[in-house]
Amino acid sequence: MRVLGLDVGDKTIGVAISDVSSTIAQGITTIRRKSFVEDVKAIEEIVKKYSVEKVVVGLPKNMNGSIGPQGEKVIKFGEKLREVLRIPVVFWDERLTTLQAERFLIEGVDMSRGKRKKVIDKLAATIILQSYLDSQKNS
């Protein structure tokens, strides 16, 4: 089963996809946000292209575990997405994933700030999805 991972921000949506065995996540694109309708259309195309059966949406939480304003926006987006796609949409704790992604790009591949901005959301989506996939294998 293929699973889609999303890192939903105000300006962009990072997108990652799993392999068919739901073992390995790979970043595939970053969607520039325009409107809910256009954002969902772009996600729908990916869902159809890869025969996705589930979507994992990174849920930003505060360090104490509470949900703040950004988390509320993401929940609203995910719930609407579930209605449109008619496949399971689950939320996954994304605390520190963007920080992890940025640290990797700085330390791991010594990438410049300009290049980092282009791939950070896709990498964060990959980390979110891989974390989810790993948890499913271990449960």
Swiss-Prot record:
It is found in: Cytoplasm. GO terms for biological process: rRNA 5'-end processing. Its EC number is 3.1.-.-. One of its GO terms (molecular function) is nuclease activity. Keywords: Cytoplasm, Hydrolase, Nuclease, Ribosome biogenesis. Signal peptide: none annotated. GO terms for cellular component: cytosol. It comes from the Bacteria. CDD domains: YqgF. InterPro entries: RNaseH-like_sf, YqgF, YqgF/RNaseH-like_dom, YqgF/RNaseH-like_dom_sf. It is an enzyme of class 3 (hydrolase). Could be a nuclease involved in processing of the 5'-end of pre-16S rRNA. Belongs to the YqgF nuclease family. This is Putative pre-16S rRNA nuclease. It comes from Caldanaerobacter subterraneus subsp. tengcongensis (strain DSM 15242 / JCM 11007 / NBRC 100824 / MB4) (Thermoanaerobacter tengcongensis).
